[in-house]
A protein has these predicted regions:
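Generic secondary-structure signature for well-ordered alpha-helical cores
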Residues: 17-25, 75-78, 138-142, 184-191, ...
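Short, conserved charged micro-motifs
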Residues: 65-68, 132, 252-259, 326-335, ...
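Residues forming anionic-ligand binding surfaces in small-molecule and nucleic-acid pockets
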Residues: 110-117, 229-241, 311-313, 384-395
Length: 532
């Protein structure tokens, strides 16, 4: 049996026995076979000495059991790594950041505690997936939508806590911002409720997120301060109609004005859905060979624009979506065309009003997430789609960039040059993604292989890219465990004041440093002292 670093076999055996007395022997896992699912399937350290491996896993069923487990762990100083469903592919999966930690697997806590149709909210546990929530709403015949990411098998709570995003209305697709009220078990086993939940018998816990005094929910986003056992979310009242339209512009430089138009529409709530930008000339696009005569990303702009004109292709397009009453979405699409017509040569297509709910035949071949319907269709993109037993995964570089056309051009030029120079095995470079208001994120997916030598080179290049992007003002919002310290190192304003603040809070709330050590680059005092 593996043991955490610094813990004797006798003490660990005593803790395991105590865990078994709380959750039942069948829900404590220590064998290699049982711990295999808690390895990161996409780990760039897989089968290397540095791979992050759990020493055990415990699967509680209730908040009371979580409290008891945390008291035991705190007493024995056992490192604990909470997960919701462990589907965080590309960002660590179910594996701990600190090797030897005991994974606290919350997937058995899969209860939907309340769905309120009149006030459009839900209260649920961390084991509830987007599929679970969608089915519950459909089974009850409720007039509500969810906003879901790709893919839909993950935890609603887990995705929000890692700052995930979706596709529908701007008020809901920032999943952490759409939460309202959190229940947290602290390292000592104490139970905390945030916002109005701190008031016994509160009637508005899922309706007012701020409550009284400082807003502390953000301390549990991408955090190592507690174990979230309940979370409320605002849901989207099902819209009556939907419109999707496409705006195209002919010149590369037109992206500047196009983004400005879209920003205005979003910031005035004249458009609700996530804007999807695209260009046939972006590098490292989705799988599929481009025409042999098509200019590449680094071809002269004049050649690109001439090719686009000759083939009746816009240089840039943005797909826009609208949700609401039929007459409202029609007016919003007309308004979009009026605003975008100021760009010379702008073209428009689509714009048909579609009555909701969507018919099954309409969903075929479409991104179902646009309609709050979870799916696994994302796995039809890339290497895993063609192999039932794939041998590679990916890590993702996820820089946040300005929501301007100039920001798009500068960031893509930098990423293209950097990945080429570092010979990073890019599989997909996403278009600028606008799931959050005010910024874009770009997803740079880098292949992970079974070859340790290749993975070692990739790790070195990935770290260099993190540093270069940061030097140009682009910070990562999320990363795999192997690079969490590297990303935190870039957030260095005023001699790393942010990290030092995180450490101060960590040492106060979790003095024994047992929860998620190293997560997002925040280490407890006893490990920091060893590293010094």
């Amino acid at each position: 049996m593996r043991t955490p670093a610094g813990i004797s076999e006798a003490d660990f055996a005593a803790a395991i026995a105590a865990f078994e007395s709380v959750v039942g022997k069948e829900w404590v896992f220590t064998s290699d076979d049982d711990l295999e699912p808690y390895r990161d399937a996409y780990s760039i350290l897989r089968d290397e000495p540095e791979e992050r491996i759990a020493s055990a896993a415990v699967a509680p069923f209730t908040s009371d059991e979580v409290q008891a487990v945390m008291r035991i762990a705190n007493e024995h100083r056992i490192p604990i790594y909470p997960i919701s469903t462990g589907k965080n592919l590309g960002y660590g999966g179910a594996a701990p950041v600190l090797s030897g930690s005991v994974v606290l697997d919350l997937k058995r806590m899969n209860r939907i505690l309340e769905i309120d149709e009149r006030n459009s909210y839900v209260l649920l546990e961390p084991g509830v997936s987007y599929f679970d929530l969608y089915r519950a709403i459909q089974d009850k015949g409720l007039n509500l939508w969810i906003d879901c990411p790709d893919p839909g098998w993950g935890s609603v709570v887990g995705n929000a806590l890692d700052y995930g995003g979706g596709y529908t209305h701007s008020w809901y697709r920032n999943h952490f911002e759409a939460h309202c009220g959190t229940e947290v078990v602290l390292a000592n086993g104490e139970l905390l409720r945030t916002g109005m939940g701190a008031l016994p018998g509160a009637k508005t816990w899922q309706q007012n997120k701020y409550g009284y005094g400082p807003f502390v929910d953000g301390l549990f986003k991408q955090s190592s301060l507690g174990v979230v056992t309940k979370m409320g979310f605002w849901l989207y009242p099902a819209p009556e109609a939907y419109i999707s339209g496409v705006v195209g512009v002919p010149k590369k430089a037109d992206i500047n004005a196009l983004v400005d138009v879209i920003n205005y529409l979003e910031n005035t709530v004249s458009m609700q859905g996530m804007p999807v930008f695209a260009s046939p000339f972006l590098p490292f696009g989705l799988p599929g060979a481009p025409p042999p005569d098509m200019p590449t990303y680094d071809s002269p702009v004049a050649e690109q624009e001439a090719y686009a004109a000759a083939h009746n292709l816009p240089y840039w397009t943005v797909t826009v979506s609208y949700y609401g009453a039929p007459e409202v979405v029609k007016a919003q699409w007309d308004y979009t065309k009026r605003k975008a017509s100021a760009i010379a040569g702008a073209t428009f297509s689509g714009g048909d009003v579609v009555t909701m709910p969507p018919k099954p035949e309409m969903l075929k071949g479409m991104n179902r997430s646009l309609f709050g319907v979870p799916s696994l269709s994302i796995f039809f993109i890339g290497a895993r789609s063609e192999h039932s037993d794939p041998t590679q995964g990916h890590i993702t570089c996820s820089p946040i960039i300005p929501r301007t056309g100039e920001g798009i051009s500068e960031a893509y030029d930098l990423i293209f040059r950097t990945t080429k120079r570092l010979e990073l095995p890019v599989t997909i470079l996403s278009p600028p993604i606008g799931c959050w208001a005010r910024t874009f994120v770009i997803l740079v997916m880098i292949a992970v292989t079974e070859d340790p030598a290749k993975n070692k080179r990739t790790r070195a290049g990935f770290r260099e890219m993190i540093r270069i992007l940061a030097e140009h003002g682009y910070g990562e919002y999320r990363t795999a465990p192997a690079f969490m310290d590297d990303v935190m190192e870039t957030y260095s304003f005023n001699n790393h004041a942010l990290r030092r603040f995180h450490e101060t809070v960590k040492d106060a709330v979790d003095p024994n440093g047992i929860i998620s050590a190293g997560r997002y680059g925040v280490w407890p005092k006893h490990i920091r002292e060893k590293k010094a």
